[in-house]
Amino acid sequence: MVKAMPEDIKQEANKVVNVDFTGQEQWRNDLKLDGNGGIRKDSVVNIQLLLDNDPAFANVIAWDDFSEMLIKTKGVKGLPIRKGFWTDEDDAVVRSYMEHKHNLLFSKQNEQDAMVVVGKEHSINPVKDWIEAEKWDGTPRAERYFIDYLGAENNEYTRAVTRKWLAGAVKRVYQPGCKFELVPILEGKQGLGKSTAARNLFPKKFSDSLKSMGKTDEDYKKLQGNWIMELGELSAMKKTEIESAKSFISAQSDSYRGSYSHYVYPHLRKCVFIGSTNQQDYLKDATGERRFFPIRCGVTKPTKTVWRNEESVPKINHDIHQVLAEVKTWVDAGESVFADDKLMQLAKPYQQEAETVDPMKEAIEDFLNMKVPSNWEKLSLSLKASFFHTHIDHNGDVATWLQQHLDAGELQPLQQTTTREIMEVVFDKSVDRYLMGRTGSEAKRIKLIMDNMDGWDRERVRINGQRSRGYVRK
């Protein structure tokens, strides 16, 4: 129960806190008092009331719902407090101000708690405000965003990837933590403005400071407060980092201790990722292909400038507002943000083109594309290896080999195989060495390649009279 200030100490209280109570009976009566009728200095509520009713701090302190951080919407006249995120220095300034103006020295913890309470009473979401800044005028623009600004290929694939990604970006603002893992990779020479095009979507909530993906706790904290996250150069990523990167991109929440928090708890994802590269081959892992969608830029002449200057900024901002307003109509109508089978088929040639050269995969493809004798399944592994290497060494001319070793009629496409067969026939890795554990890494690589090989399904097969796990041509 709030204890009202006794009438006989009003005059003295006015002198102590240096506040004019005239016409402000309600908030004055809410001040917490100590046993002697003085204003309590250990009260969070008292700090909150003083800040809420101080004209100098009117509409200054707010809570950024998107960043989950305390902010200053403007500066405070006469104090070294400037617009931006709240800092430790600002805490010190407020405590000093309270002591100078009101003769009240509050504890640092109570002052910080009060700041959060005041901020939460005035919550804002800058990204929602940015998206909703203008009403869509009905002119389609969004699907052509990278086409118009970066001269990207004007085709169904580019428009589909752009649509999915923008829809995912907007959906994460309104539905934090929604499942979304599509990452466009803007390909093209330096100077096109690839990073700038991503930044322009909302410069204040863009970051390119993420140098690794999930390797340290700092990676997760960098996501806080940013909407568009540009990835580092994918071609520089080691294969050992691929798995953690895939998990990092696919996560729907991140657990860490946020600002103004003593606790570790899950923070729902509000950001999306985009990459840019000057390389033509940068994808190193077939299992990551479904996340990365290359977009070739600089193919056509851009119809809009991506570069911001005094003249172009109003035009760019208006266009961005219209793009985002359009995308919001998609999301409001239930737009799917998942890459469907059609998009995956459209993406496949682009993803394959972006893959780094893998000699091991090329050798396996040579083996799978080779035509073999009709009695192939009955041949020993050593004889199969001899046939394969003859095929490679003589550019597919195996007639002489067949005459010398067997007469098996017309050659036909290979129909099934196993990891062991590939390991011994293609890479000369004997079973003895395999059982000794020396070729475990090769076996894993072969399995990974075959699991993602077009035209082949993983099934149980029978080879040389024995059943084992293998792969069958579709």
Predicted regions and their residues:
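AAA+/SF3 P-loop NTPase mechanochemical coupling elements
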Residues: 219-224, 258-276
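P-loop NTPase catalytic core of nucleic-acid-dependent motor ATPases
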Residues: 118-224
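A short helix-turn-beta junction within AAA+ P-loop NTPase domains corresponding to the substrate/partner-engaging
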Residues: 284-303
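Conserved catalytic/switch belt of AAA+ P-loop NTPases
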Residues: 242-265
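N-terminal nucleic-acid engagement/recognition segments and initiation subdomains in replication
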Residues: 1-140, 403-412, 431-434, 441, ...
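Conserved AAA+/SF3 P-loop NTPase catalytic/coupling segment centered on the Walker-B
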Residues: 228-249, 283-289
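Short glycine-/polar-rich loops that comprise or flank the Walker A/P-loop
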Residues: 225-227, 252, 269-272, 287-293
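DNA transaction DNA-binding modules
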Residues: 337-474
